[in-house]
């Protein structure tokens, strides 16, 4: 029952996201990605060295972890050429940019819950949102939701805990 609430609180924005299955970038974003790619395609061959993926991503404001880079490389460089073309790079960066947007959306939702600006969602915050949404949940059900998301045991849900639980419920 408690998980139904989580699903309904974010359902409308989750449904909007599902309607466009492939993330779209603005022309400016595509141009920015092209410029970063061209910077590393110094010899003009239309490919960049796969080892430069991390540096190229950093140039676009991302801080990829080593494991994340390894996974991307294994998906892109299936033939083991050590090279990546612009199309592959654009695909990777489109995915990364849409993930960034998702995180921003989740944090906006967090701020709606955290109306007293404590940096945490309290039982009181959750109860208010449930009431505003017309959800008839018992105090026990609301407390179960807090308990499920609360990792540090302080009885409230901070931004990281909220991000984790929202990603876990696959609404984003």
Curated annotation (Swiss-Prot):
Its main location: cytoplasm. The modification Phosphoserine is found at residue 20. Residues 28-63, 64-99, 101-136, 137-172 form the EF-hand domain. The gene is Cetn2. One of its GO terms (molecular function) is heterotrimeric G-protein binding. This is Centrin-2. Keywords: Acetylation, Calcium, Cell cycle, Cell division, Cytoplasm, Cytoskeleton, DNA damage, DNA repair, Isopeptide bond, Metal-binding, Mitosis, mRNA transport, Nuclear pore complex, Nucleus, Phosphoprotein, Protein transport, Repeat, Translocation, Transport, Ubl conjugation. InterPro entries: Centrin_CML-like, EF-hand-dom_pair, EF_Hand_1_Ca_BS, EF_hand_dom, RNA-helicase_DEAD-box_CS.
């Amino acid at each position: 029952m408690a998980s139904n609430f989580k699903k309904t609180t974010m359902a409308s924005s989750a449904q909007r996201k599902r309607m466009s299955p492939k993330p779209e970038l603005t022309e400016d974003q595509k141009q920015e990605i092209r410029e970063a790619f061209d910077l590393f395609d110094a010899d003009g061959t239309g490919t960049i060295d796969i080892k430069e993926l991390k540096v190229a991503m950093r140039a676009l404001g991302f801080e990829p972890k080593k494991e994340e880079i390894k996974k991307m490389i294994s998906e892109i460089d299936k033939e083991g050429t050590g090279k990546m073309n612009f199309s592959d790079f654009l695909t990777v960066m489109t995915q990364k940019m849409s993930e960034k947007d998702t995180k921003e959306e989740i944090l906006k939702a967090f701020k709606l819950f955290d109306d007293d600006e404590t940096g945490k969602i309290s039982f009181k915050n959750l109860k208010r949102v449930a009431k505003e949404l017309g959800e008839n949940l018992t105090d026990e059900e609301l407390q179960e939701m807090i308990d499920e998301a609360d990792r540090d045991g302080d009885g409230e849900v901070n931004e990281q805990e909220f991000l984790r639980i929202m990603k876990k419920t696959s609404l984003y």
